[in-house]
Amino acid sequence: MEKMPLISVVMPLYNAEKFIEKAVESVMKQSYRNLEIIIIDDCSTDDSLKIALALAEKNENIIVLTNENNMGVSKTRNRGIKEAQGEYIALLDSDDVWKEDKLEKQVSLLLNHEAQIAYCSYGFINENDRPIKKPFIVPERTNFNKMLAKSVISCSTALIKADLLKENLFDPNYYHEDYVLWMQLLKNGAKAVGDNSVLAYYRQVTGSRSSNKKNAALHRWKIYREVLNLSLFKSVYAFVSYAVCAVIKYYF
């Protein structure tokens, strides 16, 4: 039987002492077994690093790296991506979790459709692991033009071919660095396929970046005009679609 390709799970870590164990546990429980977990601590001021090191002592598949200075999430993810040895790279934030069959389903998607990016639907949980709001259900296909109207790929749901991601890292100059990356990959011909079942859960914590929407709209407009070089008309169309989707996703 052909050996399953290695998947590298890249997890940036910053002050997530309450959730890092649950995030790692959701990876260790995956039905897909050929994994390495790369945790990169970005100068946490709580016990996050201590917990990560304790987890690594118990499992040889866990690698813990530490930044000498606080680098921010984009550069921290990039460091993990560069260290990854797998044929595929999955991204997971240290306060989010996966369902047990997430990676197995996504590897099959990539292989069956000869695609480079897999994504999935996701739910929302609070600090106590309780579901909040309706899950975000994604379509089975997306492309550059569709992503202008509705962004359906996100970090903790994505599985990407490693060689593609290593050649196209996150740009730390943008607030929505993940959206910039997906759009550039799709614009350059990458194929993305989705699983509309809920395979991941985003944790919304008061005061966290994911729950802070200030200035997000301004940054998204900047991406349309300065990064993607869209016309004014197309930028307005994309921005209105983005605003409507954001309201629906986070408030209903």
Labelled PLM ranges:
Residues 1-28:
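N-proximal low-complexity "stem/linker" segments adjacent to membrane-targeting elements
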Residues 4-7, 28-39, 47, 59-63:
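Short loop->beta transition adjacent to catalytic acidic/histidine clusters or analogous donor-positioning motifs
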Residues 19-21, 46-55, 97, 101:
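Acidic helix N-cap motif at the loop->helix transition within catalytic regions
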Residues 41-50, 69-71, 93:
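A conserved acidic beta->alpha catalytic loop
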Residues 67-84, 105:
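Glycine-rich, basic loop-to-helix element that forms the pyrophosphate-binding segment
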Residues 82, 135-215, 223:
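Conserved nucleotide-sugar donor-binding catalytic segment
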Residues 89:
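Short aromatic/hydrophobic "clamp" motif used to bind/position activated sugar donors
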Residues 101-132:
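Conserved donor NDP-sugar-binding/catalytic core segment of glycosyltransferases
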